Regions:
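Residues at or immediately preceding the N-termini of alpha-helices
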Residues: 21, 58, 85, 108, ...
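Phosphate- and divalent-cation-binding pockets in alpha/beta enzyme and binding domains
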Residues: 23, 60, 110-113, 157
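Short beta-strands and strand-loop turn motifs
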Residues: 76, 147-151
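C-terminal helical cap/extension that packs against the catalytic core
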Residues: 86-144
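Nucleotide phosphate-binding/pyrophosphate-handling subdomain across enzymes
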Residues: 1-98
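Glycine/aspartate-rich loop-and-adjacent alpha/beta segment that forms the canonical ThDP
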Residues: 151-176
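A structural signal for short, well-ordered beta-strand elements
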Residues: 17, 54, 122-125, 157
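Short, active-site-adjacent cap segments at secondary-structure transitions
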Residues: 82, 108-111, 153-156
């Protein structure tokens, strides 16, 4: 579970500060998580949409992939940080849950060779963000996830990762 480490650290600090256990329990049960970080948006026709727009580098996206527990289509790409996408492509091939990808943005020429070299072939290229979300939905079977975790900065299409995440949520909330 993503965030388990920080949650356990918070519990330890709360216990050390002598916060009542019932208050700690209530806080853990009601905490909704951090916006744009493995954030559940909505389920549409049996497909769950997860916003990880904060996944602006390969390491963050690897961590997001590790939290997936059902068939997942990932949306990758954005503006370049001149990253090595080989570890990401390898993790996608090795993951029992990453079944497809939609690649968008200025980093498409950097990401697709890494996917090809790793043998990850179930991906589509899109140039429009909304179309990328729609394509990911169409690639994902009922009971699966669409994960926006780009492994890239957002500056080719958006002013910041928050704008990208908010746009993702808006598109998802408009899906029928």
């Amino acid at each position: 579970l993503f965030g388990m480490g920080p949650a356990l650290a918070a519990v330890a600090m709360a216990v050390n500060a002598e916060i009542p256990v019932d208050v700690i329990r209530h806080t853990l049960k009601t905490f909704k998580g951090v916006e744009h970080r493995i954030e559940f948006v909505r389920e549409v026709h049996g497909v769950r949409f997860i916003n990880d727009s904060k996944g602006t580098n390969v390491d963050s996206t690897l961590k997001a992939i590790a939290t997936m527990d059902r068939p997942t289509t990932i949306i990758l790409g954005g503006s370049t940080k001149h990253s090595d996408y080989a570890p990401l492509a390898k993790a996608m091939v090795e993951s029992p849950y990453i079944e497809g990808a939609v690649v968008i943005g200025a980093t498409t020429p950097e990401i697709t060779p890494a996917l090809d070299a790793a043998g990850f072939t179930d991906y589509r290229l899109e140039t429009d963000f909304k179309q990328a979300v729609v394509a990911a939905q169409s690639m994902t079977r009922r009971g699966g996830n669409v994960l926006l975790s780009p492994a890239c900065a957002s500056f080719d299409m958006f002013s910041c990762f928050e704008e990208r995440g908010d746009t993702f949520k808006q598109i998802v909330n408009e899906l029928q």
